[in-house]
């Protein structure tokens, strides 16, 4: 949607590769591209949608120094889709302190109904173990209780839909 809306400049940061467990919730994840760079897959898709898009692709896992460097560019909006707690907490804290507009994705694993998605303040999330952990650590480590816009689903996780991996 963002690329289709005419955004002129975008940076995507992701050091991860497609894994079979991503297929129930991540657009780039297909049965045919396991092991491929998520950032490169999304870059190809974004450029196919909007060939005029000025796109910076960083194929690395995010770290505090990288976040601080990217925030210096003062982006108009930040979308966080990090799925690991520690880097997510650090990213949210730095973005929050910068005063920039940010929206953060919460857990989608074991949730199947996209019509249940909501955008709310993080303090209003429930039935989301991932959001619960994010809230807990933001509060404990940084005193942040609210003021973070998030996308989450109040749908109860469906345990039967989980795929166990090693």
Regions flagged by a language model, labelled:
Residues 1-166:
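Adenine nucleotide-associated cytosolic modules
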């Amino acid at each position: 949607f963002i690329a289709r809306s005419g955004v002129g400049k975008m940076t995507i940061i992701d050091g991860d590769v497609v894994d079979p467990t991503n297929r129930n919730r991540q657009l780039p994840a297909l049965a045919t591209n396991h092991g491929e760079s998520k950032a490169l897959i999304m870059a190809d898709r974004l450029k196919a949608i909007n060939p005029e898009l000025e796109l910076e692709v960083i194929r690395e896992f995010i770290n505090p120094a990288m976040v601080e460097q990217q925030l210096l560019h003062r982006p108009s909006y930040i979308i966080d889709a990090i799925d690991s707690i520690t880097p997510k907490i650090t990213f949210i804290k730095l973005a929050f302190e910068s005063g920039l507009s940010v929206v953060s994705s919460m857990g989608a694993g074991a949730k199947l109904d996209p019509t249940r998605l909501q955008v709310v303040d993080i303090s209003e999330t429930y039935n989301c173990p991932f959001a619960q952990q994010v809230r807990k650590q933001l509060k404990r480590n940084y005193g942040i209780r609210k003021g973070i816009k998030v996308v989450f689903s109040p749908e109860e996780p469906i345990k039967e839909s989980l795929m166990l991996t090693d």
